[in-house]
Amino acid sequence: RRQRQMCIRDSDDTALKSGDVVLFDIGGRNRNYCSDMTRTFFWGEPDEETARIYDIVRRANEAAEALIAPGVRMCDLDRAARDVIENAGYGKYFTHRLGHSIGLQDHEPGDVSLVNEQVVEPGMTFSIEPGIYLPGRTGVRIEDLALVAENGVEILNAYPHDPVRLD
């Protein structure tokens, strides 16, 4: 994945230092169905730009999630999140689609992207995962799973969007 090459590295035995950003992308299975969630944490106090980026990504996530309902197009969800990021001046650093469908596989057909005009329907489950990645410097992503209901959406992740310091 392009974002991995830009700012995310696999774990190793490097000691964390104050200001480091730690991104957890985790998932599991229950009755053969997959889950997927990403949260970004800080080791110590984040620098000013990283804190600002975190807030932008959180607002982008929440803008897309607020729009999810039957009849809305996938591309409109991506546009809602992307507009928040672009209006903040970080558009070129949001380098991937907004999300992906999920079910028996962790990535199923049905991208939440600018090019997918598919209409959201009840029963669909997909991720909402905006991110900003500054090459060699920092990166933030917040990912939730959304289950579309008849009259809206149920966010399947219970973990909050508030920034968390791990130290």
Where are these regions (language model features)?
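Active-site neighborhoods and metal-handling regions in enzymes and metal-associated proteins
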Residues: 2-167
